[in-house]
Amino acid sequence: MPKKILFTGGGTVGHVTLNLILIPKFIKDGWEVHYIGDKNGIEHTEIEKSGLDVTFHAIATGKLRRYFSWQNLADVFKVALGLLQSLFILAKLRPQALFSKGGFVSVPPVVAAKLLGKPVFIHESDRSMGLANKIAYKFATTMYTTFEQEDQLSKVKHLGAVTKVFKDANQMPESTQLEAVKEYFSRDLKTLLFIGGSAGAHVFNQFISDHPELKQRYNIINITGDPHLNELSSHLYRVDYVTDLYQPLIAMADLVVTRGGSNTLFELLAMAKLHLIVPLGKEASRGDQLENATYFEKRGYAKQLQEPDLTLHNFDQAMADLFEHQADYEATMLATKEIQSPDFFYDLLRADISSAIKEK
């Protein structure tokens, strides 16, 4: 009878990425893999798109808010229903363990697993825990963290960033699409890549649209999240979404302009890619991106520019400063000890699962 593991996590791509790195390794080792999430969430889309042999189980989900809203009343019932559904799924599957990457949808499965005596392993990518993981931590066997947590928590293992990137550009798959893009770019101009993420692309899209003169100063690659903006013209490539092209585009760019999501930041760190961080503010997030950006700037990995300060003048100043000190930034990134390989984390997780099962 095959061993079973249940994954959960969703709401944004960042709450799915690590799961998609780990799942193939479990499948390769003969595990039966299941996933609990929202059928209308990005986790369902990403799992389907991956083509991996994973059984997806949909549950009801409600948003966890730190502020008063009448919607909280309705969401209490959704979360309760999600918990009942999770209990039923786990009781039926009887997995050896549950791994959660966080997000609102992950709380009911985590609680259900704990109630049924299953080991629970969770992961936190940001400088400080989000509300979902603050709740999940109470039910977890172990929490793995990308950043060292300021609070001394007994169940935390500081891991560093787990990222799957090609550090050598020669390892990346060739792309005829990328060659077509290069035909529209000038070798005399620096190439900038704007990555806004699922929650933050709009501001970058608008900034580029409002300042066509950027195309005279740089080659611009803009991952927009909006298919209506798709365009390939002189010094400009706008595309709504990329998968296989993602890392080749990063490698092609001289500098990346990004939000402050930890997954993207650590991918850029692993590739030692020069970058400017424009974090989402507290009006659009819980402030985690501000913390991540400040951490990266203090470590000497990057420079940050606050969204309200994103003017053409300030942007050009930031570009000039980054390119002037490019060698220093790259040397600091190359010397980092904060990156771990997927194989390292997989082996650690497998060992921790085995230990937890033996202790039951």
UniProtKB/Swiss-Prot annotation:
<keyword id="KW-0133">Cell shape</keyword>
<keyword id="KW-0961">Cell wall biogenesis/degradation</keyword>
<comment type="function">
    <text>Cell wall formation. Catalyzes the transfer of a GlcNAc subunit on undecaprenyl-pyrophosphoryl-MurNAc-pentapeptide (lipid intermediate I) to form undecaprenyl-pyrophosphoryl-MurNAc-(pentapeptide)GlcNAc (lipid intermediate II).</text>
</comment>
<keyword id="KW-1003">Cell membrane</keyword>
<feature type="binding site">
    <location>
        <position position="289"/>
    </location>
    <ligand>
        <name>UDP-N-acetyl-alpha-D-glucosamine</name>
    </ligand>
</feature>
<dbReference type="Pfam" id="PF03033">
    <property type="entry name" value="Glyco_transf_28"/>
</dbReference>
<dbReference type="GO" id="GO:0005975">
    <property type="term" value="P:carbohydrate metabolic process"/>
</dbReference>
<keyword id="KW-0328">Glycosyltransferase</keyword>
<keyword id="KW-0131">Cell cycle</keyword>
<dbReference type="InterPro" id="IPR004276">
    <property type="entry name" value="GlycoTrans_28_N"/>
</dbReference>
<feature type="binding site">
    <location>
        <position position="198"/>
    </location>
    <ligand>
        <name>UDP-N-acetyl-alpha-D-glucosamine</name>
    </ligand>
</feature>
<dbReference type="GO" id="GO:0071555">
    <property type="term" value="P:cell wall organization"/>
</dbReference>
<keyword id="KW-0573">Peptidoglycan synthesis</keyword>
<dbReference type="GO" id="GO:0051301">
    <property type="term" value="P:cell division"/>
</dbReference>
<dbReference type="GO" id="GO:0008360">
    <property type="term" value="P:regulation of cell shape"/>
</dbReference>
<dbReference type="GO" id="GO:0030259">
    <property type="term" value="P:lipid glycosylation"/>
</dbReference>
<dbReference type="InterPro" id="IPR006009">
    <property type="entry name" value="GlcNAc_MurG"/>
</dbReference>
<keyword id="KW-0132">Cell division</keyword>
<comment type="pathway">
    <text>Cell wall biogenesis; peptidoglycan biosynthesis.</text>
</comment>
<dbReference type="GO" id="GO:0005886">
    <property type="term" value="C:plasma membrane"/>
</dbReference>
<comment type="similarity">
    <text>Belongs to the glycosyltransferase 28 family. MurG subfamily.</text>
</comment>
<keyword id="KW-0808">Transferase</keyword>
<dbReference type="InterPro" id="IPR007235">
    <property type="entry name" value="Glyco_trans_28_C"/>
</dbReference>
<protein>
    <recommendedName>
        <fullName>UDP-N-acetylglucosamine--N-acetylmuramyl-(pentapeptide) pyrophosphoryl-undecaprenol N-acetylglucosamine transferase</fullName>
        <ecNumber>2.4.1.227</ecNumber>
    </recommendedName>
</protein>
<dbReference type="GO" id="GO:0050511">
    <property type="term" value="F:undecaprenyldiphospho-muramoylpentapeptide beta-N-acetylglucosaminyltransferase activity"/>
</dbReference>
<keyword id="KW-0472">Membrane</keyword>
<dbReference type="Pfam" id="PF04101">
    <property type="entry name" value="Glyco_tran_28_C"/>
</dbReference>
<dbReference type="GO" id="GO:0009252">
    <property type="term" value="P:peptidoglycan biosynthetic process"/>
</dbReference>
